[in-house]
Amino acid sequence: MTDVREAAQNLIEYAIRRSMIGQDDRIWAYNTILECIGATGPALDMAWALKTEKISLLHPDTLPDFDLEGALAVLSEAAVANGAAEDTASGRDRIAMRIMGALMPRPSVVNEEFNGRMGVNEPRAATDWFYGLCCDAGYVRRAAIARNIKWSTPTNWGDLEITINLSKPEKDPRDIAAAGAAKNAGEEYPACQLCIENEGYPGRSAAADGGAHPARQNLRVIPIQLDGERWGFQYSPYAYFNEHCIAMSSEHRPMHVDRKGLTCLLDFVDLFPHYFIGSNADLPIVGGSILSHDHFQGGAHEFPMMHAAEVSQFSVPGFDQVSGTVLQWPLSVLRLRSHDRAQLLDAAEKIIHAWREWTDESVGVVAHTADGVAHNTVTPVIRRVDSRGNAGGETYEAYLALRCNITTDEHPLGVFHPHAEYHHIKKENIGLIEVMGLAILPPRLVPELGAVREHLLAAKADASYDLAGALEGDDLCRSHAAWAKDVFARRGDELTADNAIDILHEEVGVVFGHVLDNAGVFKWDEAGRAAQQRFIDSL
């Protein structure tokens, strides 16, 4: 019980220092935590509760170290022991989020604080404050994100960024079993994890009607206006890059890439000129993992695509204030620039309309099949830059990645999708984030690459080692066997125990470059260059 008291009081002290609650909230906060964990004690330390000295509200970087996850773990375990939480990872997480939600300001207070900063024309200050709050409240899972493995790999396209995503929690076997027995509740609430109705939602277990849904008591959503509609602005809990934010429609409706969507993107960068914003494509295979809810993703990161070399210039007839550039990038990306927002919007819309109807069977692009299904779309990204290309200037940039989701017997998952030879590294869709040059790779690669490393080192140490047989006979390595043998043939001489994993990481980055090239509709050969020029000339 002493552990519970200490964890609760330390958590409250942390919340006070982070300006989430006030000093006079100590007793209320302590009792609220007890209620959350299904307890009626232990008694708090009254000397602590009645402290009157001013707590220094220091800059976050200078605050005393505090293990937020550790304190929440103690309290969640107490909730399990008290019968107030399921004895599962998701049950513990729901209690932790309930506690943090109770210690956070209400949405109306958060909105008032945010809009106060926006009202004095300080969007950077507004997002800094809001992002800090989301981190402090444990909604942005900083400790989990820090577990991700990251590196960059030099390629012909520039330095590609690679991440093995370890931040999202593994599914608890008990949750998986419960999900199998869950009843279908009919209409789900919230309809998906991007709906604004998630704000404050308590979550539900895998066994509940409708299945598992994460707790969102510590989620705060800022209302914003995009193209005259109400949208929500929040940060991603498992961020893939700096200040990874999400803008989502208040209406649960499908993704769509059109003039209205582009207008929303432009409105967003006018609200937050220091952020980029982009949309996943609106078709399967080339879209993201959620096509059912209209949303965008943005943040403060500069992606490799934004530093891609310029290959050639073009103009869009009728839009003399817009300059077009073909980028040296594995996907087929056209960049538009203009000081004139209206012309940029019109030019981008013209290109999207033209692309949706463009067929060039010489390179496998088919706009519509005989059944009337559309296959062409665009992954758009918008930002504002200054004369040196830094975020926040007066020049609008639109990156239009041309996409096609046609399938064939040879490539049943998609002609312009990661090909089968690379599925051992990446077989999921190439969405917005990866289009821009940041790979999000699955956690299975950690043990798999570790096992490949051991076999390569064994082969280096013993010339008689049957590398092919060892790789094929190892469940962790079988899918990587051909690739690993090729890596050893090319780089075996330089392989050491110290650099083996770095070499494998470099080679994974090279594979990611090939995967992006697979997704490009106009390849970087003579036929592809000619095909791209035909499309540009058609404008």
Language model features: what each stretch is:
Residues 1-207, 399-402, 406-539:
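Sequence termini and other peripheral, non-core segments
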Residues 154, 286-291:
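Short glycine-biased active-site loop of nucleotidyltransferases that positions the nucleotide triphosphate
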Residues 167, 282-284:
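Active-site beta-loop-alpha junctions enriched in small/polar residues
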Residues 202-281, 302, 320-460, 464, ...:
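Catalytic residues for metal-mediated phosphoryl-transfer on nucleic acids/nucleotides
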Residues 285, 304:
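Surface-exposed, flexible loop/turn segments at secondary-structure boundaries
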Residues 290-303:
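Histidine-centered catalytic micro-motifs
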Residues 306-311, 316-317, 441:
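ATP-dependent carboxylate activation and anion-phosphoryl transfer catalytic cores
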